[in-house]
């Protein structure tokens, strides 16, 4: 069978657990992603099984003889290095970035600090711990401003604020999901996203997707549960803009130490067409509305082959030492 244009020995993949569901605020989306991945792998003849860490102990993976895991978990405990660390201890290879890269990428503030240090463009921001500090951030960054939890995804807990009065409620909402609240400069312009596949020097960007949401509001509902959002792939952007985005996202991916696959979100500022990195998702959605499969289709890679190729890239952070025998 083929994945990413290469031949893959399905039997060599062994017994596979598709990790789905979990305990995060993104459980519903994860169940949809995992169900799609499971069907795709089964269609290739992979010995794949659904496994929900919210309902079963991860230690059962070893007891039941699983050889590798496809992580279709999103958000806390699945995308933040937690499950990756458990799988490292169990010695079971898994898809996506490793422990440190997953943990850093889940923390938007830490990610932005690293990107800025490396000279990568990202919107200005403030870390706040109260509604009062949120108001002060609005004065510093200007309106409108984005207020969101530092460690959530799928726009959960996110608010776009225009006035000081809106800051209080926005802070309360974001802090329900994370004590660390990020206030971020709003970039007016084109919203785009770009997947990256591969590892190290082999990492490469897939085609850019341009997103046009109703009234510019690409929220949780418009991401997953409506058909009102329009996705353009090919993006329709000038060739030099697309090339620059692809170059930046590969740098962003490598800078955080990612491997396997991820997807970066970028805004292109309307005033000067400068791209700004917003965040990187280390376990992107794989639902019917998801963007990595859409980008892959644009270069002739089917959903089924995409899933197989990602699974084949499963790895551990470090080689497992041989067990010593008494």
From Swiss-Prot:
> What is this enzyme's EC?
6.3.2.4
Q: Which GO terms describe its molecular function?
A: ATP binding; D-alanine-D-alanine ligase activity; metal ion binding
**Superkingdom of this entry's organism?**
Bacteria
| Residues reported to bind Mg(2+) 2 | 279, 281
Tell where it localizes: Cytoplasm
Task: Please report the stretch or stretches of sequence annotated as the ATP-grasp domain.
Answer: 112-312
Detail which positions bind ATP: 138-193
The pathway noted for it is: Cell wall biogenesis; peptidoglycan biosynthesis
The protein's UniProt keywords, in alphabetical order, are: ATP-binding, Cell shape, Cell wall biogenesis/degradation, Cytoplasm, Ligase, Magnesium, Manganese, Metal-binding, Nucleotide-binding, Peptidoglycan synthesis
Tell me, which GO biological process terms does this entry list? cell wall organization; peptidoglycan biosynthetic process; regulation of cell shape
Q: Which GO terms describe its cellular component?
A: cytosol
Entry's transmembrane regions: none
What EC class does the entry list?
ligase
The entry sums up its family as follows: Belongs to the D-alanine--D-alanine ligase family.
Q: What does this protein do?
A: Cell wall formation.
- PANTHER family in alphabetical order: D-ALANINE--D-ALANINE LIGASE, D-ALANINE--D-ALANINE LIGASE B
| Name of the molecule in the record | D-alanine--D-alanine ligase
Organism annotation: Delftia acidovorans (strain DSM 14801 / SPH-1)
Lineage of origin: Bacteria, Pseudomonadati, Pseudomonadota, Betaproteobacteria, Burkholderiales
